[in-house]
Amino acid sequence: MNESERKIVEEFQKKTGINFKNEELLFRALCHSSYANEQNQAGRKNVESNEKLEFLGDAVLELFVCEILYKKYPEAEVGDLARVKSAAASEEVLALVSRKMNLGKFLFLGKGEEKTGGRDRDSILADAFEALLAAIYLDQGYEKIKELFEQEFEFYIEKIMKGEMLFDYKTALQEIVQSEHKVPPEYVLVRTEKNDGDRIFVVEVRVDGKTIATGRGRTKKEAEKEAARIAYEKLLKERA
């Protein structure tokens, strides 16, 4: 880590109260592949992205969620548990948890990802959260993960079990728009962009021909979901 990176790592620990023995693990968890590639191409040696930690974190998350389900819902059918596990470990839920702890603020992103709104993209936040789980697991063990996140995930799991939270921003946006305008929102692919060699889809969501939000993603579906989320949150603020 250089000095500016260390300051961000230290600020993350101060703001969240999650203190690492090995700060390099935390740095790696916060390091998106676009940033690692950019730094390595600039001549730095062995700047590693969070992809391997994300791989481990996916398994840690699955165990964590399954343990909560096994203990709290002993009478539930296996099929129901599998459905809830999938929802509780979904990109949408992980992005919610990430936003609550302001994880996006501390991510190291390449210039392209920064420019295209990667800091608040569900997929990037969810991947970074999984990487963070792995880093905590390696640094402080599984019990620390339970201490930090068990209560929050129990809350989401309970809502999912009750059918109150299988959240779909596109459906939620459509309900608001149709109640006010009597027509569904329209999703329009306006262009594609290049970012570190990857194609980024840019989608506008429109109501009565007027653009209300723009989303970006590595697939058209992801860009539509992002546009729907931004539009939904914007409309909620306007209603408040």
Curated annotation (Swiss-Prot):
Gene3D superfamilies: 3.30.160.20, Ribonuclease III domain (1.10.1520.10)
Location of this chain's protein in the cell: Cytoplasm
Gene Ontology, cellular component aspect: cytoplasm
Domain of life: Bacteria
Domain DRBM per the UniProt entry, residue ranges: 168-237
Chain's role: Digests double-stranded RNA. Involved in the processing of primary rRNA transcript to yield the immediate precursors to the large and small rRNAs (23S and 16S). Processes some mRNAs, and tRNAs when they are encoded in the rRNA operon. Processes pre-crRNA and tracrRNA of type II CRISPR loci if present in the organism.
Complex and partners: Homodimer.
Identification of the protein by name: Ribonuclease 3
Gene behind the chain: rnc
